[in-house]
Amino acid sequence: MQNGDIITGVDRFPPANTGTQEITVNFPEPMRGAPKVFAMWEDTTITLTYVDKLVITGATSSGFKIATNRLKPSENWWFCYIAIYNR
């Protein structure tokens, strides 16, 4: 793999009211092109009782948008991601 082919990271949804929330995640360095992005909750004990799945939209070389339907307010929900650019 060359530089710009894979980026991994951790980010969080800030505390908010219940309901759908979307944030933009910026990569620490640009990728070569629009990557495939995969994400999962950092805490594997989180179940759908508390939060819904992660939905990724708008992946570009500089970052992506990610949304979730958070059912529990006033907590930080951490997730990890991997972005892979395959030419």
Report residues per predicted region.
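Extracellular receptor-binding modules and their adjoining Ser/Thr/Gly/Asp/Asn-rich linkers
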Residues: M1-K36, E42-T45, I56-R87
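Short, surface-exposed beta-strand/strand-loop-strand elements in extracellular ectodomains
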Residues: V51-K53
